[in-house]
């Protein structure tokens, strides 16, 4: 899932065809459901990546503290105060952390998309009300 793809998809979904207001109003529920599914899928993926991050942190902590399994351990010794910096800069942990941050951006975007779909429903209602007013009803 890419942010650019989600942006393009939202751009198409928020468009209101003023010649089909009844259809657009009915379709709004389906659009909200679609984006809610995307939101929950992204949240689920973030939980999986958070678990991966914990495993990676534990493995790298064991590596740097010399408690690693077998022959894999760091010859460098770090103080406890240095360990936090060393772990956060480790390439394995950094890769997982970057992935988690990217999925966080996707989650924020989907949350905004849900708000946009809600606003779309209100906009459709206002257009219908304005047309009724203009027709003298």
Curated annotation (Swiss-Prot):
This is Recombination protein uvsY. GO terms for molecular function: DNA binding. Homohexamer. Interacts with gp32. It comes from Enterobacteria phage T4 (Bacteriophage T4). GO terms for biological process: DNA biosynthetic process; DNA recombination. It holds the Pfam family UvsY. Keywords: DNA recombination, DNA synthesis, DNA-binding. Plays a role in viral DNA synthesis by promoting enzymatic activities of UvsX recombinase, by promoting UvsX-ssDNA filament assembly, and by helping UvsX to displace bound gp32 from ssDNA. InterPro entries: UvsY.
């Amino acid at each position: 899932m890419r942010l650019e793809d989600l942006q393009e998809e939202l751009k198409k979904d928020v468009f209101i065809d003023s010649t089909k207001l009844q259809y657009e109003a009915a379709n709004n529920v389906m659009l909200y459901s679609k984006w809610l599914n995307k939101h929950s899928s992204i949240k689920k993926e973030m939980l999986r990546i958070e678990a991966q991050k914990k495993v990676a942190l534990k493995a790298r902590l064991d590596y740097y503290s010399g408690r690693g399994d077998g022959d894999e351990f760091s010859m460098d010794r770090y103080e406890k105060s240095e360990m936090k910096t060393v772990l956060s800069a480790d390439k394995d942990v950094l890769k997982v952390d970057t992935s988690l941050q990217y999925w966080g951006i996707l989650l924020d975007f989907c949350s905004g998309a849900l708000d946009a779909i809600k606003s779309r429903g209100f906009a459709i209602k206002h257009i219908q009300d304005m047309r009724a007013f203009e027709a003298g009803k």
